Amino acid sequence: EFEAAIRTVCEPIFEKPLKDISFGQLLLRLFQTARRFNMEVQPQLVLLQKTLLNIEGLGRQLYPELDLWTTAKPFLERWMRKRMSPKAMLDNLQGQLEQLPHLAQMTRAALEGMARPAHGAPPPRDRHILRLLGAALLAGGVLLASRAPLNVADAWPGWLMLASGLYLLVRRQRFPD
């Protein structure tokens, strides 16, 4: 549904010269769409809006017949080939693998902290909540890991959820009710 809304906003400007495009209206509609889907608008997007409005004004003065999409297509294709190349994916995977040991330690500490009662708090009467959380994490992890794109590095949140869910379900054997 979100994709269709974005397509509805953006398709009317494809293959139009710069003189026929209002970036102000385009960005306003994009922000309205984001709000409609309860998405937070990042400060960087406001800066992007300002930059695009400046480009629009300058472009209309210098070359109003410019077709941005035709002009930008070779640059965007080259950029995408570079970003999705095997070397770029390997570099991305390597960077994420370097973070995994820290992430695993932080996740374990957080899960163990959830399992221990807070200082001065009464001991939990029902540990079913942790089991339910474990089952939810396990199910979510399976869904995320199975729907991950071809880039294996993007699947780590699903695997992390899967591992956390398994930990919460298995740890009950060490700490029975």
From Swiss-Prot:
Transmembrane segments annotated in the record for this chain: 129-146, 152-170
Annotated localization: Cell inner membrane
BP term (GO), one: ubiquinone biosynthetic process
InterPro entries: Kinase-like_dom_sf
SUPFAM superfamilies named among the record's database cross-references: Protein kinase-like (PK-like)
Domain Protein kinase: from-to ranges: 1-130
Pathway: Cofactor biosynthesis; ubiquinone biosynthesis [regulation]
GO cellular component, one term: plasma membrane
Enzyme Commission (EC) number: 2.7.-.-
Alphabetical keyword list: ATP-binding, Cell inner membrane, Cell membrane, Kinase, Membrane, Nucleotide-binding, Transferase, Transmembrane, Transmembrane helix, Ubiquinone biosynthesis
GO MF annotation list: ATP binding; kinase activity
Main location (coarse class): membrane
Domain of life per record: Bacteria
Signal peptide: none
Top EC group: transferase
Topology of the protein relative to the lipid bilayer: Multi-pass membrane protein
Task performed by this protein: Is probably a protein kinase regulator of UbiI activity which is involved in aerobic coenzyme Q (ubiquinone) biosynthesis.
Family affiliation: Belongs to the ABC1 family. UbiB subfamily.
This protein's name: Probable protein kinase UbiB
Lineage, uppermost ranks: Bacteria, Pseudomonadati, Pseudomonadota, Gammaproteobacteria, Pseudomonadales
Recorded name of the encoding gene: ubiB
